[in-house]
Amino acid sequence: MSFLCVRTVSRFRSLSRALAPGFLLLHGNAVPKTAVFFRQQSSNTRLFSSYTAPSGVEENNSKSALKNKLPPGKEVSSKDAKEKITTSAIDLALNSVVKVFTVSSKPRLFQPWQITMQSESTGSGFVISGKKILTNAHVVANQTSVKVRKHGSTTKYKAKVQAVGHECDLAILEIDNDKFWEGMNPLELGDIPSMQDTVYVVGYPKGGDTISVSKGVVSRVGPIKYSHSGTELLAIQIDAAINNGNSGGPVIMGNKVAGVAFESLCYSDSIGYIIPTPVIRHFLNAIEESGEDVSFGSINLTYQKMDNDQLRKDFKMSDKMTGILINKINPLSDVHKVLKKDDIILAIDGVPIGNDSSVHFRKKERITFKHLVSMKKPCETALLKVLREGKEYEFNSSLKSVPPLVPKRQYDKSASYYIFGGLVFLPLTKPYIDSSCVSESALGKMPKKAGEQVVIISQILEDDINTGYSIFEDFQVKKVNGVQVHNLKHLYKLVEECCTETVRMDLEKDKVITLDYKSAKKVTSKILKSLKIPSAVSEDLQPKQQNKRSKVPPKSKEH
């Protein structure tokens, strides 16, 4: 069995020890505490790198110590030529990199009407043009407070999260204080480094409170699944130590930023990952163009490779043709309008796709074609060259991402829930699957309608009215009074607007629950009161209250 350890190794300091949620494994008696969670699934094992703690790898708080790490005149290769790392470049980094202090809290997974204890964590960030600070989304996810401290200062400045891109694990902070910006210099984005290029990771990792720098070499460039979002995007692997707390800090090559530090490989020494500049620019451009809507392109289909000779022959591919075979297409996607099952995608925007699903990247490097797809904006189209029953066709189609049936991750939002007769209904999410006995089969399914959700009975708050129903925890609700359930809001509406004495719910595996409507409503009120639950329904499901204030008509002019 392969293992995936997703560790949020942010250092969490409990602000209320007695309220520690069950999913936190608290080690030792002294605060601060470290929150760690594990799950089994895949061989891709990585960890986040936000932290707050003393460490043995800190650098001296002086510029001279950093200069020892980054000697002037040190030669490193760039994309086209070699550049010299000068003292001015080091000084620029010192006057740009900041430490980010975050207090966060999120809804409990199984009691969504409650929030977890507040926790403190830290990460890094750096100044970019426009008086903005770039950091990781996971550094400020579910934040209730964000503060920033610059190098050489003891003052923490209040920061505002201006924009977040959870897909790409990036965020922008703003600080409305002129004193903070005194002496601060923005860093400039560079190009993707080449293999064996030397880079320097600057930030505030574990082990101390001062700025630190570590040196590494680029060992690999290619898409990976970002741990924060589960989205597959381009990343750069380096052998520099990206420790807890480095998240959000710049990785410098020459006098420019090569990427943002954000992950490292569990149980491996000096294998770190950085977000490259094409992903950063895509994020920044999206913020500039649409405010807060940050999304990356998606192929919205499943496919298989065409390595087998007989398979290529049966699908009428010539010896010169290469591509991938379409297995299933998301019915809500734009490509569903032009592509068909068993089509062979030969090329995207004129770039041939190999039988192994790779495309040419640079020199002799190849990466998955998904990188070309991910860099598409929602408003852009791609030219798809397709082989269908032996004939070649070309189609223009948008590659706008379609929300999955089961969300991978959810941040910065209140949880949805509905309680009726002691039954707690929730929309199924991947974190819920990872923390329960629910089958992962729903993860591979595609939505048939926009807004569709898998609604489950998360738990049953015991009462005489639901006796015998506890065995149906984690079961999906298929129908309410014979009507197919579209999502949680639809279920809420079907139950609340019930006109019959009995509410019937058809579950998966052909199981059935029935409740007397009036009795269930009374029991719900009793349960809410006894368990101190503020409401039977989350705010997002409640109908918006219309403004009942009567408008005062304008006074008529006297003639």
From Swiss-Prot:
Transit peptide location on this chain: 1-48
EC main group: hydrolase
GO molecular function, one term: serine-type endopeptidase activity
EC number: 3.4.21.-
Residue ranges of the region described as Serine protease: 100-292
InterPro entries: DEGP_PDZ, DEGP_PDZ_sf, PDZ_sf, Peptidase_S1_PA, Peptidase_S1_PA_chymotrypsin, Peptidase_S1C
All copies of domain PDZ, residue ranges: 300-380
Chief location of this protein within or outside the cell: mitochondrion
Active site: 138 (charge relay system), 169 (charge relay system), 247 (charge relay system)
Record keyword ATP-binding present: no
Disordered: region residues: 59-81, 538-559
Protease as UniProt keyword: yes
PANTHER family in UniProt: PROTEASE DO-LIKE 3, MITOCHONDRIAL-RELATED (PTHR45980:SF10), PTHR45980
Protein family (similarity comment): Belongs to the peptidase S1C family.
Role, per record: Putative serine protease.
Protein name per its UniProtKB record: Putative protease Do-like 3, mitochondrial
Lineage: Eukaryota, Viridiplantae, Streptophyta, Embryophyta, Tracheophyta
